[in-house]
């Protein structure tokens, strides 16, 4: 059975100094979401992959909701052309709002902020607080070290084997979009396995 997907939260870098292959993947993902009329939810940044995925979704006829703390707006770090801009008070509120608005998460490569967002949403799913698909878009094998670390966590019993199904890995934007439709929704009762 296909999941009903109206919105997708995309985590990604704000850096402008990264390889063009990452920008290509971000634009392709934004285009696919826009063409399918899937609302893009992100952190409303006006630089890097965050801006690239937003601009591509908008060009393809999609809608973008950006969620950003007020202090970042005051710094002028927000994208001014989004369909909707939601200002919040803190980084914590930003992440919760993005999760609450989304039917799935796709993580593109990024730095500490992206990695922190991804690991937090994985943790929420482990605890049964987020039940929707989480897809890691492994452009240029960027996430291989993280995936190795997660496998090691399972191997050494810091996580259960069942927790390996919390996330799925895609190599292309097309595969990532297909996975958000086909990945089974998580069962909240899994939280009984949260502790080893």
Residue ranges and their predicted role:
Residues 93-128, 135, 186-192:
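Active-site/ligand-binding-proximal alpha/beta "capping" segment
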């Amino acid at each position: 059975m296909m999941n009903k997907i109206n919105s997708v939260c995309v985590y990604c870098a704000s850096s402008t100094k990264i390889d063009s292959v990452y920008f290509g993947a971000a634009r392709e993902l934004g285009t696919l979401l826009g063409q399918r009329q899937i609302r893009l939810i992100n952190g409303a940044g006006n630089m890097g992959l965050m801006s690239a995925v937003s601009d591509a979704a908008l060009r393809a006829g999609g809608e973008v909701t950006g969620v950003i703390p007020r202090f970042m707006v005051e710094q002028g770090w927000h994208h001014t052309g989004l369909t909707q801009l939601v200002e919040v008070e803190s980084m914590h509120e930003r992440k919760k709002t993005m999760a609450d608005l989304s039917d799935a998460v796709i993580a593109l490569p990024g730095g500490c902020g992206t990695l922190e967002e991804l690991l937090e949403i994985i943790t929420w799913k482990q605890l049964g607080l987020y039940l929707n698909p989480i897809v890691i878009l492994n452009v240029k094998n960027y996430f291989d070290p993280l995936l190795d670390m997660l496998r090691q966590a399972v191997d050494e019993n810091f996580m259960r084997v069942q927790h390996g199904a919390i996330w799925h890995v895609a190599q292309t934007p097309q595969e990532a979009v297909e996975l958000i439709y086909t990945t089974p929704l998580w069962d909240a009762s899994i939280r009984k396995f949260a502790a080893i």
